[in-house]
C-alpha cells in the first residue's frame, strides 16, 4: 500500500524555534508575514519576540502611524517600510512620484486610539492633559497599576490642546493659550517637587499658540508649529532658530505635520493634495547639528519621499516610535 509521506511544515516546529527565526528577520517584513497565518500573527505581536530580538541584538527603530479613513469604523495602523539596500535621496522639488522604496505599510491590528488626553509617561506614572477644545488648566496622573486618573497640580494657565514632552524627569508644556501670554506660554512641571515653573519667553518670533509637536533631540527641545516655524530650546541656554530647512518649509504648506524621534534623528510627516485631489503623505528624515565655532543649529534633510497616498478626507490620529 502506497501512501504519500507528509512533508514537515515550518509551523510544526516549536514556537521557540519559530520565534528565533522571526527575531532574525527585519521588521520591515512583519506586516506581510502577519498575513501568512494566525500563528505568525500571534507570535509577531508577542512579548516573547521582543525579548528574543533584544537577546539577539537585532532590535530596530521603527515609526508607526495611526490614520482614520472615512469608510472604516476604526483607525488603521501603518509602519514605515524602507526597502533593504536602498540608497535614500531627497525627492523634494523634483516633481517626481514616489520611488516606492519607502512606504507606509498597513499593519493588521484592532488597535483603537480614542483618549481625550495628551498622555506622557514619567517612570511608573502616566500624566494626562486635556485635548478638548475648551481651555483647561487641569492635569491628571495615574500609576501603571491603577485604573483611574487622579487630579494633579494645575498648570498656571488654561490651555486647549497643548503639546507636552518629558525631558530629564520633567514635563514641558507649550502652546494652547494666547500667543500674547508670554509669561505663561510655556511652563515646566517638576515631578519631584510637584510644582510648575514658567519657561523663558521665546520672544514674538517664536511665540505661536498652535504647536504641532515637541520632541527631545540631543538634550534639546525641538518645536514645530502650524505656522511652519522650527525652533530649538535648550533648558540650559535659550531659544534658537533651526536653519537650513527652507526647502522643507516651502513644501510643508498647511498639511498635517507630525514629528517623531527616529533613530537619533527627526522624522517629519506631512501631507499635500495631489493632481487627483487625494493627498500624498510625505516623510523626511532630518539630522540636526551645531556648527563648530557657532551657536547656530542647522538641519540637514537626509531623505524625503512620498510614502502613502490617501483620500483627502482622512484624519491623522497619532504616531509612535518603537525600538525592538
Swiss-Prot record:
Classification via Pfam families: F-box, Kelch_FKB95
KW Chloroplast (keyword) present: no
InterPro entries to which the protein is assigned, alphabetical: F-box-like_dom_sf, F-box/kelch-repeat_ARATH, F-box_dom, Kelch-typ_b-propeller
Residue intervals passing through the bilayer: none
Keyword terms, alphabetized: Kelch repeat
Claim: Ubl conjugation is one of the keywords in the record: no
Kelch repeats: 170-216
CDD domains reported in the protein's UniProt record: F-box_AtAFR-like (cd22152)
Ranges of residues in domain F-box: 7-54
Cellular component annotations (GO), alphabetically ordered: cytosol
Protein name: Putative F-box/kelch-repeat protein At5g28160
Protein source organism: Arabidopsis thaliana (Mouse-ear cress)
Amino acid at each position: 500500500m502506497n501512501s504519500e509521506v507528509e512533508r514537515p511544515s515550518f509551523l510544526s516546529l516549536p514556537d521557540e524555534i519559530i520565534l528565533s527565526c522571526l527575531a532574525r528577520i527585519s521588521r520591515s517584513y512583519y506586516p506581510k508575514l502577519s498575513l501568512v497565518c494566525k500563528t505568525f500573527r500571534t507570535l509577531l505581536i508577542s512579548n516573547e519576540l521582543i525579548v528574543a530580538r533584544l537577546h539577539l541584538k537585532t532590535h530596530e527603530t521603527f515609526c508607526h502611524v495611526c490614520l482614520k479613513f472615512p469608510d472604516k469604523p476604526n483607525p488603521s495602523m501603518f509602519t514605515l517600510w524602507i526597502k533593504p539596500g536602498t540608497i535614500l535621496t531627497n525627492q523634494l522639488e523634483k516633481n517626481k512620484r514616489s520611488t516606492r522604496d519607502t512606504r507606509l505599510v498597513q499593519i493588521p491590528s484592532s488597535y483603537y486610539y480614542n483618549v481625550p488626553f495628551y498622555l506622557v509617561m514619567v517612570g511608573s506614572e502616566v500624566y494626562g492633559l486635556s485635548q478638548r477644545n475648551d481651555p483647561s488648566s487641569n492635569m491628571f496622573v495615574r500609576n501603571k497599576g491603577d485604573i483611574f486618573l487622579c487630579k494633579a497640580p494645575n498648570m498656571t494657565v488654561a490651555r486647549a490642546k497643548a503639546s507636552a514632552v518629558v525631558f530629564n524627569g520633567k514635563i514641558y508644556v507649550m502652546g494652547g493659550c494666547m500667543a500674547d501670554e508670554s509669561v505663561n506660554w510655556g511652563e515646566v512641571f517638576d515631578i519631584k517637587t510637584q510644582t510648575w515653573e514658567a519657561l523663558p519667553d521665546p520672544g514674538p518670533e517664536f511665540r505661536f499658540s498652535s504647536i504641532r509637536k515637541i520632541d527631545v533631540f540631543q538634550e534639546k527641545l525641538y518645536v514645530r508649529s502650524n505656522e511652519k516655524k522650527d525652533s530649538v530650546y535648550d533648558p540650559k541656554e535659550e531659544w534658537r532658530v533651526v536653519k537650513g530647512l527652507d526647502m522643507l518649509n516651502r513644501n510643508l504648506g498647511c498639511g498635517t505635520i507630525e514629528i517623531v524621534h527616529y533613530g537619533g534623528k527627526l522624522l517629519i510627516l506631512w501631507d499635500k493634495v495631489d493632481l487627483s485631489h487625494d493627498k500624498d503623505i510625505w516623510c523626511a528624515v532630518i539630522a540636526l547639528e551645531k556648527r563648530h565655532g557657532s551657536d547656530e543649529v542647522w538641519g540637514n534633510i537626509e531623505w524625503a519621499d512620498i510614502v502613502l497616498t490617501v483620500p483627502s478626507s482622512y484624519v491623522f490620529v497619532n504616531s509612535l516610535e518603537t525600538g525592538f
